[in-house]
Amino acid sequence: MYKRQAVNRSLLIDPHGEIVARYDKIHMFDVDLAEGESYRESNAFRPGGRAVLVETPWGVLGMTVCYDLRFPHLYRGLAQAGADFLAIPSAFTVPTGNAHWHVLLRARAIENGCFVFAPAQWGEHAEGRRTYGHSLIVDPWGEVLADAGEGVGIVTARINLAAIANARRMVPSLQHDRPFTKPELAARPLAAE
């Protein structure tokens, strides 16, 4: 299925220029959007298979990439394993960005009580592909602290590390999360009246 051995990789580089962590994107963007817009990331890349956490001076960072954002169990696993921050560098298309970018990032921050750092590609690219932009920083309560909007730019925000514990104390969803058996469709459907 995966024709090439390249990976879509995110790197964490320390202040001395050394690579301290690398994450290979797990979920490939193989989609058919409206008006014939279609993408097959698996034609160029093979998926990674391992979630990555790295200790930083400020807390634990969970690393992901782009389309991974649509798989909440990945982020729950990172948070349960100790992530305080989630890095999600992305190249969302304009249609998917307009519809889903802000809400998905805010949801991942809220449901896991984490800060979200989401640098985002913006602009027009080969074959008419357009990316949404809007690099964001979101706090654990879901408040957008910084939004680059459209265009080239850098976002920064002053963050309060106590916000992580506060959000998790007020809504302790990480503690309340319980394993469950995936449902099966009932053998006999209900009769319609």
Outline where the language-model segments fall.
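Short beta-strand-to-turn element immediately C-terminal to the catalytic PLP-Schiff-base lysine
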Residues: 12-14, 138-139, 157-158
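Active-site loops and adjacent core secondary-structure elements that bind or stabilize anionic groups
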Residues: 1
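Active-site catalytic loop in hydrolytic enzyme cores
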Residues: 4-81, 94-103, 170-173
